[in-house]
Amino acid sequence: CGVNKNGTITSFAWTYDSAKKTFLNIHQRISNDEGKTWSQPKDLNISDQPSHPALLKDGKVVLAWVDRFKNQSIKVIVSDNLNAHFDEISEVTIFNQKKIKQNSKELGGLLADMNIWSFGLPYADVLQSGKVLVFYYAGNDKKMDLHWIRLKFE
């Protein structure tokens, strides 16, 4: 979740549909009343795991996410405000993992296949300078590290 300067809360969620045995796209919900009520989930057409959003002073929203199952990467994307569409033209890849063959498409097999979990958990936030800091973990079966990148949006 993130809270903008007006007190509006936004939530980004990644879920698994156990009936269809598939991961769903990231969905966004918004609350304008301190979390008492929420908008209907909005499908962002982005798959996999979202980060904490960076909410810039000018209203822009920067969302990082793990593209674990398609490109095995971590990406960021920007929208002009909480209600705006995230435009693919703003998408930037900040980390690429060595391609790993997935042994299963079933949830249990995916969770057991630890190779695809050797990177992730991005977290985005705004620095005092106005730049966005995104940090995440990445590595291999022998060593994990924390990585970070600072981004400037104009």
Predicted feature locations:
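Asp-box/BNR beta-propeller blade signature and adjacent active/binding-site loops
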Residues: 1-154
